[in-house]
Every structure is written in C-alpha cells, then in structure tokens.
UniProtKB/Swiss-Prot annotation:
This is Non-structural polyprotein pORF1. It comes from Hepatitis E virus genotype 3 (isolate Swine/United States/swUS1) (HEV-3). Pfam families: DUF3729, Macro, Peptidase_C41, RdRP_2, Viral_helicase1, Vmethyltransf. Residues 800-957 are annotated as: X-domain. Zn(2+) binds at H671, E673, H686. For methyltransferase activity. Its EC number is 2.1.1.-, 2.7.7.-, 3.4.-.-, 3.6.4.-. Disulfide bonds join C434-C481. Contains a methyltransferase domain, a Y-domain, a putative protease region, a zinc-binding region with similarity to calycins, a proline-rich disordered hypervariable region (HVR), a macro domain (also called X-domain), a helicase domain and an RNA-dependent RNA polymerase domain. Since the boundaries and the activity of the putative protease are not clearly defined, the zinc-binding region might be part of the putative protease.
Length: 1708
C-alpha cells in the first residue's frame, strides 16, 4: 500500500523548495538507467559525461565496455525513436530481434571481430536467418537484410540509422550511398575524439586512452576488458570538419546530440546546403599542451618507448587555467620556474574535505609535467614581454600625441574622421607574430574550435560531361546507352502502395502557408452559368441569376468561414464548418466536408476548392461531373433592383418545393446565396436577415425537411416533366443528359424512408456497434488504426489461384487494397461505408479520387482503398452493372479484400454478388462474408478446397527440407523438393475424441502419416501402414494418404506429402498444439499453411461432461456421449498414463510422456503433472492444456503443486470448499421465478405519443424546484473518524472537472464524485467509520417477534443445486473460478474485502447539491468467501420462501402480477412505509447475533458460523489507495447481503410495530411496505431502537412508494415514472454507443410495464409526488422518444466543488 498511517509530510516552506522538489522528481522520472556494474572511477566518468541527465544505477550485468555501451544505448534510443521505420546500416547482431521496426539491414561479410559477434548472436527470430547467412556465406532468405554493404545496396528507404558503422566511409561516400537508397535522412552515431586532429602520439584523458600512430587511432576507455575502437584517422578528421556535401548529392550534416566525444549526426538531403558552422567540443575538459622537443630517441635493435610518446599532452582545463592565472599575476621579482613547479605540484594533489572535493587534482606523467612547466613558463614570459613592451611603447606614443601643435590636430580632425566603423585601438599595431614562432602559443583548446567545411561528393562530374559528348554514340543510333560513367542516382519509386520497399515519411509534409481570404468580393451571376447548367437549374432561373450581382463579405477563422451575402435589399448569412448539415429538398441527407488546410469543401456529388489570387478569390467547382471556374474580384458589386431579386427568390423557392414533392431523391435545397455566392451551391447554416421577423417571405429561404412535405406519389420522370411544365411560374425543364428528377440512387448503406421501401437487413459483415445510428457529432478525429489483438476471421475456402473466402471483418485483412461498398456520389453513408469513414475519413476527399473506369474511385489517402458501386436492386435488377462493379476494381497492382457488394441495403442476392466476384477477381484476393452469407456459402461451396503453394513458400519449405535432410532423423528427406502449384485436399476437423481417426477404413487409404511414434503404433495395431513424417517421405508418392493430426506436422513435411499424394485426407483439430519450431529458425511460422476444414464434427465420444464444460470456450458446439459426469480430481494418487508438459518433467517422472507426444491418443485414466518450469508454456498456449485435459475417458488426476492450471481457471477449489462447508449432492427447487411479459389487452400506452425531451425535463425541474447545477459533483466535508484505523495516501490530488454525456443539464439526484480520492475517504469514514452502538441482550424476544413473518426454520442442507446456481451466476458475470482460492485463512487474499465507490446516486425531490451526505460504496467480499457461504445462504433463502405466508413478499422472489393483485385486493387499507437512515452502518453485534441464531436453526456447521461472525466483527476494507480497519457494520458486497438485510428489516418491523387489519407486507433489503388500517409502536420497541441506535422514518399515507413502484391499494402496483426519469437524468450516456444502447434497452423494458396502465399511472403517480398529471404525461412521451433512439445528448464539462478542507482524524 502506498499510504502510511497518520503520516503528515513536512510542509514546503518556500516556492523555491517546491520548485526544486518538482525538478528533482521530474529528473528521477526521466533518468537514464545504468545496468552494468561499474567501478568508482567509471561511475564518476559516466556522471560527468552524461550531464545534465540524471542517472539511476541498477547494476545487474557485466559488460566489456560499460561506459561506451551505456552511451551507445542512450544514443541508439534517441536515433530509433526519431527514425521510426527505417533502414539500418551495420546493425549489431544482438539488436536485430529487439527492433522489428527496421525495414532492411545492410551488412558486410564478417571478418575479424565481426565473426565473433555473429557467433554470439541470437539463434532464434530474425537474427537466426542473418546469422546463418553470415557464418555460412549463404544468400539472404528474404529482403529484410543483405550483405552488400551500405554503398552497394539499393533497397529504397526514406530514413536510415547507422550506429557506429560509418567510421570506414567518407562523408562523400555516404552521400552517394544515401542517394542510391533514395534516402532523405540518416541518423548516424559516431565516435569522434578531438585527439585525431593532433599529431601522432599517446593521449591520456580522464575518460579514455587514445593511441594515434598517424594512420589509425585506437581508443580504450577506463576499465575496458577487451579491445576498443580502431578507426582511420583521416576519415574521422573529415567527419569532424565537414558540415555539408556539395555536388550532385548535396547534404547538410547537423550534430543533434553529443555525449562526450560521441555524436549523433543527422544527415539530410538538401538541394542547396547552407553554411552551418559548429563548435564540436564546447564542454571539453582538457586542453592539449605541446611538448617543444617531442619524443626523443632513434630506431635501434631494441624497441624504444620514446617512439610512442606524444608531442601533445592532455591537461585538465582547471589545471592549465589556474596555472596560467597564478603565473601571469606574480610579481616580477617573484616569478621563476621553481615557483611555478611548486604551485603545479600543489594543485595536482586531490584534496577532499568530507564528501566535498576541495581540489580535483591531476595524476600526470613526468613527460606531461615537464611539457606543462616548459610551455607555461615560456607562454608567461612571452606575455610579460608583451606587457612590458606595450607599456613602454604606449607611453612614448602618449608623449608624442600630447606634444602635437594646433596645426597637426586640425589636420587629424579634417582628414582622419572615424566614421561608423571606428573601433578604439584598432589603429595601434605595435607587434606582429608568425604562426611558427614560439610566441604563437604552446597549447590547443578544443573549446574554441569552429568548423564549417564543405566537401564535394565523389560523383564523376567531369567524366560525366565527357561521356555526354563522346560516349553515348549508341543513343544517336537509337540504342539504349549503358554508360558506366553514369553516377549513382537516387531512387524514385512508385507512390508506395505496391512498392514493398517504399516506406513513407513519419514527418508530416510541410503545409503551404495559405493567405487570409477574408475580405469583400463581388459575385456576378454570369460567371456561374456553367454551374447552373451542371445543376440542371431551369432556364428562367438561370437567366434571372445571370443578370444579378451580389456583394459577399467573407470572414475567415481557423476551421470556419462566415459569409454575409447582400443581394439587393436582402442579406443572407452562412457559416461554413466541417460536418455542417446542408438542407435538402428530398430524403437524402447531405453533410458538408470542409478542410481549411486544403481550402476545399464538398458534399454529395458537389465539391469546390478556393484560392486567393491577385485577381481575387478563385473558386473551382465540380458538380455532377462538370467543372466550373470563377474568379470573384475584390470590392463591392452594384446593387440589384429589389423587384428582380424578389422575383428570383420566389421562382427559386417554387423550384425547390416542386423538386421536393416530385423528385425521387431530391438534392440540395438551393438558397439564393447558393446560386449567387462565393461557395456555390453550398449554403450551410443559412440565415435570412430580415427587418421584419414575422415576414412570410422568410419561408422562401429557410425550411426544415419533414416527411409531411414529401409527396408519397412518386411518379416516373416521364410523368413528372409535364407536371413541371404546367406548374405556374415555372419554366419548361431543360433537356440535359441526366434529368434533374432522376438523381443518382441513394447510398447503398444509407438510411431509407420506411414508407417507400421495406426494412433492409443488417449490412453485411458488420458488428452491431457499427450499424448504430448516432446523432451527428463532430467529424471523428483521425486516429492511427491499431491492429486487433487477435483475428476473429475464419477461413472458409481457398481457390487454386490463391484467392480466399473468409467469414469475419474486412478490416482484419492484410491485402494491399480494401474495397468499400460505396454509392454513386462516393459520400459517407451508413453501414460498411460508415465504418470506412470512421476509420479513414481522408479516403472520402473527392480531390484525392483517381477515376480509372466506370464508377469506381481509387484513393491512396490514407491507404489504398477502392470505392466500388453496386446497382440498387430495389430500383432495378442490373446484372451487367453488378459485374462491372467488381470488374472496375481490378485496375490495380496487389491484392484486394472485398465485401459482398450490394448484398446490404441494395438487396442484391448473395448468390449473384458472389458469382460476380468469383468471375471478376485477381489471384490472391480475399472475400469477407457475414455470418448469414457464410452459412449460404457453407451449403454451396465446392467439394474440395485448394491450397496454393507460392514460389516464396516453396523456396522456404525447400530450405527447411535441406536442414532436415542434414540430420539423422530426416535422412529420408534427402533429395525431396516442393514445387509451386495447387493441391486439393479434404480436411475433417473435429473436437477431441470425435472419432476422426476411427472413421478411416483400410480400403480407403494406402499410407497414414502421423506426427509421433505413439500414434504410429496405435494406427499399426489397427492394421494401417502408418509412418512418421520423415520416414513417410519414401512411400507417399502417388498413394492415397491420410495425415492424422495434420496441424501439428512440420509444415514443410505436410506440404511435401500433400503434393506427392494422389489424394490427401487431413484429420485434426485446429485448436490443438500446432507445429513447433524446434530449430527456432523462423521457418515454421513462415510456411505454415492456412487449412480450411471441409467438415466439422462436434460430438465427442471420449470427453466426460465436466471436461466438455471446461473446453466449451474453444468448442462452443461440443456435445458428448459419455455418461461420466465428473472425471477431474485433484491431488489424489497418480493413476494411469502420466502426462507432463516439458522434457525435464518427463525425465523426472518415469513412464510419463509429454502432452505433445500424447496428442491424438486416448487413455482410460490419466494423471496430469504440472511442474513449475511449464508456467510460460501453459500461460501462452491454451492448446497444451486442452490436449492434456482431453486424453482420458474415465478419470483424470491433476497434480498441480505450483498452481499453474489454477492460474488459467482449471481448479476444483469451489467444489472442495463446498464439500468442506458441509454441502451434499442433492436437488432443491430452482430459485428462478418464472416471469412473463404483460399482454396488450388495453394498450393505453399507444395514446402517449413521443414528446420533446427538453421540455419534459424542464417541466420536471419546475415542479420539483431543481435548477441547473453549476458544478458536476460535490465533495462533502469528511466526517470525523469515530472508530477504527484509517490508512490514507499522502497526496489527495483531485481532478477539477468532470466530463459528462447526459440527457439534460438539470440533475435530479444527489450529486457526488465517485472517482475522487477525497470522495472515497469521505464514504469510508462516513459509512464505516461511525461509532457502533453495541447492544447486549438476548435474541429470543426478537426471534419470537420475527416468527410472525418467518416461523422457526428446520434443518437445511446446501446441495449441488445451489452450487450450480452460484457457478451459473458467476459465469453470467463473465467470471471464472480462478479468483476462488483454497480456504487458507493465513492468506490475505482469501479474506480481503475490496471497497470501491458507486457511480450511481440517489434520486431526490430535495436538495441535490447542499445535501451534506457522503457517497455510496460497495464493500465486496472475496470470491472465496462468496463461494463458501453462497450455497448455504441460497438454501436458507429457499427455506424461508417456502415458510412465508402468502401475503408476505420477500425481495424479488415473486411474480409482479401476484403482488399487484394482493395490493389491489386491499382497497380499504393505508400504506405504512418505513425508511431507514444508515441501515448498514447501524448494524451491530445484536443484528449479527440474530443472523447467527437463524443459521444455527438451519443446521449450518458451527465452524462456518464462527468464521462468519469473526469476519463480520473485525475487518479491513481495502480501497485502491486507502484502507480502513473497523468493526461490525454491514457490507454491501457480502454473499448474503439481501437475505440478512431483509431478515433484520422484518425483525425490526415485527418487533417495533403492531398493525390492525394487516393485509399485505413486502420487504426487500432496507425497504418495506405494509398495508393495514392502523398501526402503533409496541412496548418493546424503545429498548431495541435505543439499544441499536436505529434511525426509523415512518410514513403513513393512502399511496406509497416501494422498490421503484407505486403501491396504490385497490389499484395495484404502478411503475414510478418520476423516479425513473429522474435517475435517467443522472446517467452518463457515454463515452461509447454501447452504454447508450444499454440505457435505451432499459427504457424499453420500463415502458413494457406501462403497456396497460399508462393512463392510471399518470393520475396516481402525480398524486404521490404532488405534481401535475401533465408532467407525468410528458415524461412518458419523453421515454418513448428515448426508446425510439431519438434522444438528444449534451456533453458538458463542469467543475467539482470541493468542500473537504481537511480530513479530521482522531488520534488514539
């Protein structure tokens, strides 16, 4: 637990300390983890190098080069994070398996040290293939790697990574290689020590030792145990100095990261490299001091150490700076060489004072000390000489200047003016020196080095020019020139959709800066005449519009355009935003798609783009396939005559209305600014600004679509034309190619009016969540598609050309293209089209469409998608159009995944669409079917599926055969090969023990191939010629072959036998153990075929009933003929055949076989032994557990000491605990109460039409006095902790706001914040931390009173019936037995009580904010205790129900109609209600004792009663970050909460009150109601109420409330409409559509109870709450609206009101 008891952190006194603490926490959270073991010196070096990064040392590994590798890993992480999917140059073998994001790796053939690296490379995964090719000299097995080197490889990739692999390549060579790869960015990590800039020698620094021999540089870091870096000095110098490459392949080189002398260089291809000077070593800790004489000695017979001595020595910066400061400031008399030597000796000692380093010191050699003293002395002497000379010469100059006369000064003033470029002292030049003089200096400081050198690339520019003139004579002859002098050119690949080597950039392309288009523009109608023709506007309207002009004021803001159009004396406003709904004159819906960045918008078959040009705003419009371009000049237009404007508007309105009444589909409603605006024909958010708001002329421009305005008389186009011509005021229609009344048919997946077409079936291949129609939200945010965790598709059939038929979701496909079932306008529709729009909204940009042929539209944004258009068979059956729909999708390269086009709302028969796909697809394509279509296909599919062996599969399988042939086991496979081709097969799949093997007859087969020797012997005993896979390679040629357990055979051997046999019949179970890659070479998964079962057998003759239930998740349709009910037993002596999971367990258990070897075998009795080494196998492979559990027919003993099978839900703990608690095998009556739906005999609900949701809730707020709350929740002050011990976290951070998706902003429930930490504390303390009032008294009196309701209970026995009901309830909740543990009370998990805050609040007619009540919580007992006590409590509850009088109703255990009849029969009674306050909190030792008394009556075991008393009397509630240790109380999550709360409620009512004319009583938890004529408090009530601290609130009235219903004597029970509607207002209907659908179904269930009593409910419920009947009437109508799926939701973000200033604690 993160909290400490009663700990208060010391306050932070200053803001500086708070900022420092936050900075320290942030540094630690982002620290670099150092894993190797380091010495003290290595640790100090690493800390200094990695500054300012924080380091965290967690030593766990030993490395040869710890310092370099830590730096390498840090820079590698940076490079890979920036590069994304990339090409890698010279990858280290150990990093191959850890980085699957690499597209291709370039290697060189290993020599020297690289051979050792390859030998130690991983032997599994992708690295195994690379390792095999490197060490054996084999060619690569795939395109993920090569051994051509970076310079000779031509794999196309946009981004590259080179980690310490470019030290042998010049920068110019790298530029040429990048161009060869088509690469634009390369992240290169290089080690560039500054010592390579110095002469040869040996250089000691604080971090490393560098030996420079003139040609090579060898670097070894502190503590290295093997050789270090060895690189060419000249290449390193080039990398240090070069910042750009010029020539044919220009580059810029930028240093983006540096740790010491380790750099990350970003090489970027740039057309014109600019100067990029940089300082490579600004944090260098050494200066290099030159030795004047250098190394001495001469070559001799014996090698001398002098030849390796350096001419420069690395001196710490602090030593040199302090020495120079000391010497330069000495007095002339005190300056001498001996004093300098004394000072240098002093500062070279390291001095520490405690943990503080006072002087860092310097451990130098004799040569270095001598060189430093010499250089320092001579340098200081030179500086002193300059000082002396400067002072003396300066004094003489001053004397001369001040001695000048007036004439000389006047001459200087006239002819020596300074000007702007005057710098004081610049004219003085007393001293000049040469570079080779001693006075030029003796040391080099890397901190001031600046480099900016450009290097030309090595392309043969001159030779290329010569070749262009003299070497291409063949071109003149018409032949192709293959001139060898041509340079390497960068690759320009395909756009990317069919080029496997192409990888797009992860960096968003730079978007062009768009000019602000705001301004005033003049629109002339004659500019848009081409648009009017495209829109099929009648001639007279087009003529009127051409004569008019309009002035448009455009205001642009991010993602929004506002237009104010002035047309004569009328003004219109429109607002362009993405997702705006456009008004239509038909049932078709139009949603505007607007992209401000692209400056485009579109809806339906209309789209436009706009651009600001010098001439004005240029708009390109595409409408119904025709294009129009107009340029609107800036400024205002002449005002049009009001009469002409009015005539134009009236004619346009009549045209829209006529189209609305007579067109089949309609189109856009054309407003005046839609024809005379700058964005025609769009007018989103149309508003007409009129001086008179009641002017009827407004109806000409503003309308709302309704079905009442749509004529149901749909006449054909031929009949519509005469009507149009005869309409008054309308012109004759124009004769365009496509008549305006016959618009394109609606989208295949769109919603269709229910009156015009029958309801369509659910669109094909979609889950229900996709088909949900939601209110139009903002356009969905584009998120990168995440692959599903596991595929659910099911292979149904494979064609000879490789095409496959699946049942499942189209989006699980790996094909290059996805085919969308679109509409002629390619607009976002419903169903599958809507699913495409949700995932890929960019795919519907009309500007990105590529029209190949017909109606199909191809798009590559954001991935390759084909929008295919099938015919609408509701309008016309057109088989040719259906064929063309599929044919138009074949103009592509690559494979495509199809749905069944047209089989959804367009109602094309499945068979026709399937046949069309079968005739018009390409090899390798995939077809995805819905479950109904899959059922049709299963009944009509071809007899035998086909398996296609491609060239790649054959090549990989032959490689596996070669590897097998080299082993002793696989000698029989020598010379065997697999060739590409097609294999037909029959595959019988079935559940374990279904008799697949027994169904094979000897006359039907020649050879049987089995995976194991055990199976081979079993088949041979039956008389079959059976062989293992390797041996069978000699006998399967041309034979009839049966392959048993086919999925477990090595796939290359499976393909070999299938191809060689004359006929092949496969047997197996796809859910059992597949083929295992024992070699870890990666070949098995690469060639594993997808086998489609031709038949499934679901009846097992082997598995007992309990095993079938365990494996039903894998086999939903499994049935058994076995009569054995229970066969699994735990921890009994081993019997029968022993089954283990690993080879180690097999060696430890003589006679055992592994599960893999037992696959396909049958035993009478088995023993499963699970050992600890099989944990990973069992958790990762469900197939191993299935095989182990399905080998026996009678009995299986499970020995699971480590608990491995229990972790995956295979345990008998529930059964053991049941029998331990005294349960017996037996039968009781089921606890399920039969319920039925009310018949519609009156149907009064039909008289309540759907009503407005907003008005209903507003009326409810007015009646109850509730108002919109400014806050989302209230955190009430935390009460004082009166008893117990509270553990709480130190930080009580809370969120400031809550996001809610609700029906209304007026909430009618007590507001709380369930997810807040302070709310959890308040609930814990307020509900369970109050002091319990103990009551010591005998229970006999209360039990005697309780006998009025519950007579004395006889012995009760918990049976397996209750156990079954308990398990059934757990399964319905999605639980398994893994959470039920063995009854070990020392284990905290057995008795843990988990607390969590409830998210639902209580409906109230009072105050919703200032109620001062704490929240509600659930304290859930452990599953172990629930399973232990649950069967007993269920049995006791059944016995109580059997003893109850008929007029006493308990909980929910009754039929509602019976309770209603009992209430209606008590017409002369009043309703007695009792409401408890703090019902759970006031339960104490007395209520617990009464529960134990009842348990004893029932014969429950004493140890179980005492355990229950112990758990209830002292407990710990465990919240996520808090816990409370307390006593007594009642927990809402106990297994018997409802039972014992109801019993305690009955006992209190029976003991405290006496009733006259008692008729009916109902009890449920703390809620109760009694129908009687009068009542009084009994004489014994005061003692019980005072002793237990009960808080009773009695209400006695004619009509009452109980458990969500209204109790009306004489009428019956009625649904509580007000309470239900109030609770709905508090629900969060988001964030997804699933939650909204659940609540909608709950509303439908509630309305079902109102079927016959709606009118009575209005009168009665209004009297209970004191509200008007009209409110209840409106609430019922509002519920009808919600049930119809037409609810309106509001998304609100409200603050949380925090009233908890402090948590009050009581210190014991």
């Amino acid at each position: 637990m993160e909290a400490q008891q009663f700990i208060k952190a010391p306050g932070i006194t200053t803001a500086i300390e708070q900022a420092a603490l936050a900075a320290a926490n942030s540094a630690l959270a982002n620290a670099v983890v150092v894993r190797p073991f380091l010495s003290r010196v290595q640790t100090e070096i690493l800390i200094n190098l990695m500054q300012p990064r924080q380091l965290v040392f967690r030593p766990e590994v030993l490395w040869n080069h710890p310092i370099q590798r830590v730096i390498h890993n840090e820079l590698e992480q940076y490079c890979r994070a920036r590069a994304g999917r990339c090409l890698e140059v010279g990858a280290h073998p150990r990093s191959i398996n850890d980085n699957p994001n690499v597209l291709h790796r370039c290697f060189l053939r290993p020599v020297g040290r690289d051979v050792q690296r390859w030998y130690s490379a991983p032997t599994r995964g992708p690295a195994a293939n690379c390792r095999r090719s490197a060490l054996r000299g084999l060619p690569p097995v795939d395109r993920t790697y090569c051994f051509d080197g970076f310079s000779r490889c031509a794999f196309a990739a946009e981004t590259g990574v080179a980690l310490y692999s470019l030290h042998d390549l010049w920068p110019a060579d790298v530029a040429e290689a990048m161009a060869r790869h088509g690469m634009t960015r390369l992240y290169a990590a290089l080690h560039l020590p500054p010592e390579v800039l110095l002469p040869p020698g040996t250089y000691h620094t604080t971090s490393y030792l560098l030996i420079h021999d003139g040609d090579r540089a060898v670097v070894t870091y502190e503590g290295d145990t093997s050789a270090g870096y060895n690189h060419d000095v000249s290449i390193l110098r080039a990398w240090i100095r070069t910042t750009k490459i010029v020539g044919d392949h220009p580059l810029v080189i930028e240093r983006v990261r540096a740790i010491g002398c380790h750099f990350v260089l970003l090489l970027t291809a740039a057309p014109e490299p600019s100067p990029m000077p940089y300082v490579p070593y600004p944090r260098s800790t050494e200066v290099y001091v030159r030795s004047i004489f250098g190394p001495g000695g001469s070559p001799s017979l014996f090698p001398s150490a002098c030849s390796t001595k350096s001419t420069f020595h690395a001196v710490p910066v602090h030593i040199w700076d302090r020495l120079m400061l000391f010497g330069a400031t000495l007095d002339d008399q005190a300056f001498c060489c001996s004093r300098l030597m004394t000072y240098l000796r002093g500062i070279s000692y390291k001095v520490t004072v405690g943990a503080l380093v006072a002087n860092e010191g310097w451990n130098a050699s004799e040569d270095a000390l001598t060189a430093v003293i010499t250089a320092a002395y001579l340098t200081i002497c030179h500086q002193r000489y300059l000082r002396t000379q400067a002072i003396s010469k300066g004094m003489r100059r001053l004397e001369v200047e001040h001695a000048q006369k007036f004439i000389t000064r006047l001459y200087s003033w006239l002819f020596e003016k300074s000007g702007r470029d005057y710098i004081p002292g610049r004219q003085l030049q007393f001293y000049a020196q040469c570079r080779r003089w001693l006075s030029a200096g003796f040391h080099l400081d890397p901190r001031v080095l600046v480099f900016d050198e450009s290097v030309p690339c090595r392309c043969r520019t001159f030779l290329k020019k010569v070749a262009g003139k003299f070497c291409c004579f063949m071109r003149w002859l018409g032949q192709e020139c293959t001139c060898f002098l041509e340079p390497a050119e960068g690759l320009v690949g395909d756009y990317g959709h069919d080029n496997e080597a192409y990888e797009g950039s992860e960096v968003d392309p730079a978007e062009p800066a768009h000019l602000d288009v705001s301004g005033t523009y003049a629109v002339h109608g004659r500019q848009l005449e081409a648009l009017y023709r495209a829109l099929n506007v009648p001639h007279d309207i087009a003529a009127r519009a051409s004569r008019l002009t309009a002035t448009v004021e455009l205001t642009a803001s991010p993602d929004r355009l506002e237009c104010r159009t002035v047309l004569g004396n009328k003004t219109f406003r429109t607002t362009v935003v993405d997702g705006a709904h456009l008004e239509a004159n038909g049932p078709e819906q139009y949603v505007l798609s607007f992209d401000a960045s692209r400056q485009s918008m579109g809806a339906g078959s209309h789209s436009l783009t706009y651009e600001l040009t010098p001439a004005g705003l240029q708009v390109r419009i595409s409408s119904n396939g025709l294009d129009c371009t107009a340029t609107f000049p800036p400024g205002g237009a002449p005002s049009a005559a009001p009469g002409e404007v009015a005539a134009f508007c009236s004619a346009l309105y009549r045209y829209n209305r006529f189209t609305q009444r007579h067109s089949l589909t309609g189109g856009l409603w054309l407003h005046p600014e839609g024809l005379l605006g700058i964005f025609p024909p769009f007018s989103p958010g149309h508003i007409w600004e009129s001086a008179n708001p009641f002017c009827g002329e407004g109806t000409l421009y503003t309308r709302t679509w309704s079905t009442s305005g749509f004529s149901s008389d749909f006449s054909p186009p031929e009949a519509a034309a005469p009507v149009l011509a005869a309409a008054p005021g309308l012109p004759h229609p124009t004769p365009p190619v496509s008549d305006i009344w016959v618009l394109p048919p609606p989208s295949e997946e769109s919603q269709v009016d229910a009156a015009s077409v029958p309801p369509a079936p659910e669109p094909a291949g979609l889950p229900s969540s996709i088909v949900l129609t939601l209110p139009p939200p903002l356009p969905p945010v584009r998120k990168p598609p995440t692959p599903p965790p596991s595929r659910t598709r099911r292979l149904l059939y494979t064609y000879p050309d490789g095409a496959k038929v699946y049942a499942g979701s189209l989006f699980e496909s790996d094909c290059n293209w996805l085919v969308n079932a679109s509409n002629p306008g390619h607009r976002p529709g419903g169903g599958l089209c809507h699913a495409f729009y949700q995932r890929f909204p960019e795919a519907f940009y009309p500007t990105e469409f590529i029209m190949r042929e017909g109606l199909a539209a191809y798009t590559l944004t954001p991935r390759p998608i084909i929008h295919a258009v099938a015919p609408d068979y509701r309008v016309e059956q057109n088989p040719k159009r259906l064929e063309a729909a599929y044919r138009e999708t074949c103009s592509r390269r690559g494979t495509a995944a199809y749905p069944l086009l047209g089989s959804g709302i367009y109602q094309v028969p499945v068979s026709l669409s399937f046949d069309a796909w079968e005739r018009n697809h390409r090899p390798g394509d995939e077809l995805y079917l819905t479950e109904p279509a899959a059922a049709w296909f299963e009944a009509n599919k071809p007899a035998q599926p086909a398996l296609t062996i491609t060239e790649d599969t054959a090549r990989t399988a032959n490689l596996a055969l070669e590897i097998d042939a080299a082993t002793d086991v696989g000698r029989a496979c020598a010379g065997c090969t697999i060739s590409p081709g097609i294999v037909h097969y029959q595959f019988t799949a079935g559940v374990p023990g279904s008799g697949k093997s027994r169904s094979i007859q000897q006359g039907d087969v020649d050879v049987v191939v089995v995976p194991t020797r055990e199976l081979r012997n079993s088949w041979r005993r039956r008389g079959f010629a059976a062989f293992t896979p390797h041996t069978a390679a000699r006998v399967t040629i041309g034979r009839r072959v049966v392959i048993d357990e086919a999925p477990s055979l090595p796939p290359h051997l499976l393909l070999l036998h299938m191809q060689r046999a004359s006929s092949v019949h496969l047997l197996g179970d796809p859910n059992q153990i597949p083929a295992i890659d024992f070699e870890h070479a990666g070949l098995v998964p690469a060639i594993r075929p997808e086998l489609a079962p031709t038949s499934w057998w679901h009846v097992t003759h082997r598995c007992p009933a309990d095993v079938c239930e365990l494996i039903r998740g894998a086999y939903p349709k499994i049935q058994t003929t076995s009569r054995v009910l229970r066969s699994l037993f735990w921890n009994e002596p081993a019997i029968g055949q022993k089954l283990v999971f690993t080879q180690a367990a097999k060696a430890a258990n003589p006679g055992a076989i592994t599960v893999h070897e037992a696959q396909g075998a049958t035993f009478t009795e088995t023993t499963i032994i699970a050992t600890a080494d099989a944990r990973g196998l069992i958790q990762s492979s469900r197939a191993h557990a299935i095989v182990a559990l399905t080998r026996h027919t009678e009995k299986c003993v499970i020995l699971d000491a480590p608990g491995l099978l229990r972790e995956v839900g295979i345990s008998d703990v529930i059964v053991n605990n049941f029998f331990l608690a005294g349960g017996e095998v037996g039968h009781h009556r089921p606890s399920v109460i039969p319920r039925g739906n009310p018949d519609q005999n009156l149907g009064t609900l039909q008289a309540f039409p759907p009503s407005c949701q907003i008005s209903a809730y507003h009326q409810l707020a007015e009646e109850l006095g509730h108002r919109p709350a400014p806050v989302a929740a209230v955190l009430p002050p935390c009460p004082e902790l009166e008893q117990g011990l509270l553990y709480m976290p130190q930080e009580l951070t809370v969120s400031d706001s809550v996001l809610v998706f609700e029906l209304t902003d007026i909430v009618h429930c007590r507001m709380a914040a369930p997810s807040q930490r302070k709310a959890v504390l308040s609930t814990l303390v307020g509900r369970y931390g109050r002091r319990t009032k103990l009551y010591e008294a005998a229970h006999s009196d209360v039990r005697e009173s309780l006998a009025r309701f519950i007579p004395t209970i006889g012995p009760v026995q918990a049976t397996t019936c209750e156990l079954y009901e308990l398990v059934e309830a757990m399964v319905e909740k999605g639980q398994d037995g893994s959470a039920v543990l063995e009854l070990d009370l020392c284990n905290r998990d057995v008795s843990r009580i988990t607390f969590f805050q409830k998210d639902c609040n209580k409906f109230t007619t009072g105050e919703t904010i200032a109620h001062g009540k704490v929240g509600q919580g659930i304290s859930a007992w452990s599953k172990t205790f629930c399973a232990l006590f649950g069967p007993w409590f269920r049995a006791i509850e059944k016995e109580i129900l059997a003893l109850l009088p008929p007029n006493i109703f308990y909980g929910d255990a009754y039929e509602e109609s019976v309770f209603a009849a009992a209430v209606s029969g008590a017409g002369s009674c009043m309703v007695f209600e009792n409401d408890f306050s703090e019902f759970d909190s006031t339960q104490n030792n007395f209520s617990l004792g009464l529960e134990c008394v009842v348990m004893e009556e029932c014969g429950m075991p004493q140890w179980l009663i005492r355990l229950y008393h112990l758990v209830r009397s002292a407990w710990i509630l465990q919240a996520p970050k808090e816990s409370l240790k307390g006593f007594w109380k009642k927990h809402s999550g106990e297994p018997g909460t409802l039972l014992w709360n109801t019993v305690w409620n009955m006992a209190i009512i029976a003991h405290c009150y006496e009733f006259r004319d008692f008729r009916v009583a109902a009890f449920k938890g703390d809620d109760s109601v009694v129908l009687c004529s009068d009542y009084r408090q009994s004489r014994n009530a005061a003692a019980l109420i005072a002793g237990c601290g009960l808080k009773l609130k009695v209400d006695y009235r004619p009509i009452g409330l109980y458990a969500g219903v209204v109790v009306a004597p004489g009428l019956g029970t009625l649904p509580d409409v007000v309470r239900f509607a109030g609770r709905l207002s508090e629900k969060n209907w988001g964030p997804g559509p699933e939650r909204a659908e659940q609540l909608r179904l709950a509303v439908c269930d509630f309305l079902r109870g109102l079927t016959n009593v709606a009118q009575v409910c209005v009168d009665v419920v209004s009297r209970v709450y004191g509200v008007s009947p009209g409110l209840v009437h409106n609430l019922i109508g509002m519920l009808q609206t919600i049930a119809d799926g037409k609810a309106h939701f509001t998304e609100t973000i409200k603050p949380v009101l925090d009233l908890t200033n402090s948590i009050i604690q009581r210190v014991e």
